[in-house]
Amino acid sequence: GTCEYFGGDYALSDITMCTFSKSFGSIGGFVAGDAKVIDYIKHMARPLIFSASMPPANIAAVIKALEIIEEEPQRVARLRYNGDLLRQKLQGAGFDTGESETPIIPLVVGDNEKTFMMWKGAFERGLYVNPVISPAVPPHRSLLRISCMATHSEEQIEFAFSVLKEWGGKLGLI
C-alpha cells in the first residue's frame, strides 16, 4: 500500500484501507483507524450499512495471500520488476501510461471505440486486459488497465508488449 511504498509508519496514518480484490485474489477489504473514525464509518457509510460479511473461504484466501507476501518478499520485488519492465516498454514505444508506478498499468487510448477495438484485438491474440471507459474515467481518457503479476515471465511481458504495440500501431496511438 501507500505507507509501505513510501516507507512510512502505519501508526502515523489516520486511516488505512485495503481491497482484497487485487493482490489478494479475493473479495472485500478493510478499513482500519481510530475507534471513533471506524464507529462513524460503521454507522454512516451507506455501502457498509447494507453489506454482508466475507465468506470464510475468501477470508482463508486472504490469510494465505498475506502469509505468502510475508514469507516470500521476492514475489513483491518480481511484481514491481514486471510492472516497471512493461511500463518502460510501453512508454518507450510512445504509449501514454499516465503517472502510475504500480503493476496495474493504465494504457490511455482516449476514444471509447478504439479502446474496445484494442481490447478485443488483444483478447483475440490471447492477452486479457480490462477496458475502462467514461464515466469511470473522464471523457476522452478511456484506457486499458493492464495487470502484471509476479508470476509473469519476461517472455509473457514481451508478448503482452508486442500485442499492445501491434494494436497501438493499427489504431494510430503510437
For each of these PLM feature ranges, what is it?
Residues 32, 64-68, 86, 118, ...:
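Short alpha-helical scaffold segments that flank and stabilize functional sites
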Residues 57, 69, 118, 149-152, ...:
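Short alpha-helix boundary/capping motifs
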Residues 71-74, 110, 152-155:
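Alpha-helix N-cap and loop-to-helix initiation/capping positions
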Residues 77-86, 91-126, 136, 140-141, ...:
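Conserved PLP-binding catalytic core of the aspartate aminotransferase-like
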Residues 132-133:
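Cytosolic Rossmann-like ligand/nucleotide-binding regulatory domains
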